[in-house]
Amino acid sequence: ATEDGKRAVPLKDYRNIGIMAHIDAGKTTTTERILFYTGRNYKIGEVHEGTATMDWMEQEQERGITITSAATTTFWDKHRINIIDTPGHVDFTLEVERALRVLDGAICLFDSVAGVEPQSETVWRQADRYGVPRICFVNKM
């Protein structure tokens, strides 16, 4: 808040955006690029080097996968964008379910080589249940 008690960014300019897909489709890598190009990070973190901003747990860094949904904030134009990077492994589907409840929209990533994979279909159906609007992002081209 500012000195006069008002929000620095009005609530109407907040966006809660989820990143969802099958494991290894590039969710965390894409999130790292968003953070870099919006000026949030000065360096792009790499999943397989254990330097990704969003994979903060030691086990995530060791395994190179997202285990828990992680949230961060960046800014674009006049908007505050809260990004939630969700796990892609089937064992962590409930993490995606929890995140969907607060999303204004989601980016659904698809690996251009692997195509539509089972967990992508699962998270798509989950987003349908919560009425979350999505855009598709085809990755690894």
Curated annotation (Swiss-Prot):
InterPro entries given in the database record: G_TR_CS, P-loop_NTPase, Small_GTP-bd, T_Tr_GTP-bd_dom
One GO location term (cellular component): chloroplast
Main localization category: plastid
Superkingdom, natural source: Eukaryota
Localisation per UniProt entry: Plastid, Chloroplast
Gene Ontology biological-process annotations: ribosome disassembly
Database matches in PROSITE patterns: G_TR_1, G_TR_2
GO molecular function, one term: translation elongation factor activity
Binding annotation for GTP: A21, H22, I23, D24, A25, G26, K27, T28, D85, T86, P87, G88, H89
Record's keyword terms, sorted: Chloroplast, Elongation factor, GTP-binding, Nucleotide-binding, Plastid, Protein biosynthesis
Pathway named in the protein's UniProt entry: Protein biosynthesis; polypeptide chain elongation
Domain (tr-type G) ranges: 12-141
Entry function: Chloroplast-localized elongation factor EF-G involved in protein synthesis in plastids. Catalyzes the GTP-dependent ribosomal translocation step during translation elongation. During this step, the ribosome changes from the pre-translocational (PRE) to the post-translocational (POST) state as the newly formed A-site-bound peptidyl-tRNA and P-site-bound deacylated tRNA move to the P and E sites, respectively. Catalyzes the coordinated movement of the two tRNA molecules, the mRNA and conformational changes in the ribosome.
Family named by the database record: Belongs to the TRAFAC class translation factor GTPase superfamily. Classic translation factor GTPase family. EF-G/EF-2 subfamily.
Protein name as catalogued: Elongation factor G, chloroplastic
Taxonomy of the source species: Eukaryota, Viridiplantae, Streptophyta, Embryophyta, Tracheophyta
